[in-house]
A protein has these predicted regions:
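Catalytic beta-strand/loop cores that center a nucleophilic Ser/Cys/Thr
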Residues: 46-88
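Conserved NTP-handling cores and scaffolds of large molecular machines
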Residues: 9, 32, 66, 102, ...
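Cysteine-nucleophile active-site neighborhood
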Residues: 1-55
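Short, low-complexity, polar/charged sequence segments that are solvent-exposed and flexible
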Residues: 14-17, 44-48, 75-79, 110-114
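Short, glycine-/Ser/Thr-/acidic-enriched flexible segments
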Residues: 2-3, 32-33, 61-66, 97-100
């Protein structure tokens, strides 16, 4: 998502395929250069516009640079992450799982002019898992399932 919002994605080592340079959408003034190291890491960051702590995970393979990186989306361990367009209306980040953070989600929706709900992500997940477990208990013969699996 973040990388394709930029102007170009270059892959000189052919990590993701044979195309050396791919044109992005150009919504952010950034360029990404693919690198061999893929990073998938649980991350805690601070969303700069709201000051909210964001818990999520970071996925990226490469380095993104450019003018819009001077307006980072967040910081993690005092390292800037992401970019915000000069207009302030387009942003990108390597952070995933942002909307599972209740305070960030409320801030984001409010800034879109929408009324945030009081939904608690963790409570909703627990409720859904409990409902699934109840359904499975009612409709699946667990002992038969286990004996077949052996």
């Amino acid at each position: 998502g973040y990388q394709i919002l930029g102007k170009t994605i270059s892959d000189p080592q052919g990590i993701e395929g044979t195309t050396v340079v791919t044109q992005g959408l150009g919504y952010l003034d950034v360029h990404t250069k693919m690198k061999a190291d893929k990073k998938v890491t649980p991350t805690t960051a601070i969303h700069l516009a709201s000051g909210n702590q964001i818990n999520g995970y970071e996925i990226h393979i490469g380095e993104t640079t450019g003018n819009d990186c001077t307006r980072p989306f967040a910081t993690s361990n005092n390292v800037p992450d992401g970019a915000i367009a000069y207009s302030g209306q387009i942003m990108g980040t390597y952070l995933h799982g942002l909307f599972t953070n209740n305070n960030f989600r409320k801030f984001f929706l409010k800034n879109l002019g929408l009324k945030p709900s009081n939904l608690d992500f963790e409570q909703e997940i627990e409720k859904s898992l409990d409902q699934l477990a109840d359904h499975l208990e009612q409709h699946v013969d667990i002992d038969a399932f286990i004996s077949i699996a052996r």
